[in-house]
Amino acid sequence: MTTQRLVHMANQVAGFFSSYSEGEAIDGTFTHLRSFWDPRMRREIEAHLAKTGGAGLTPIALAAVKRLAEKDTAAQKSA
């Protein structure tokens, strides 16, 4: 799956939650990505974040991907 497709998908998820408060939208998007995206998809979107700063992601999707990257990094360090 291409990075551009993953960006589009993350933005779609964030769009679903856009009617919620900002915090709830970020939480919902993060939870969806963490629960339903394959680890390879998560690694790819995290690599996109590291490489480009999250180019193309909406603010809600960007915040959720940043949180995802932080949680995955913390989990790797504690393992």
Regions found by a protein language model. Name each.
Residues 1-31, 35-79:
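Intrinsically disordered, low-complexity, basic-enriched segments
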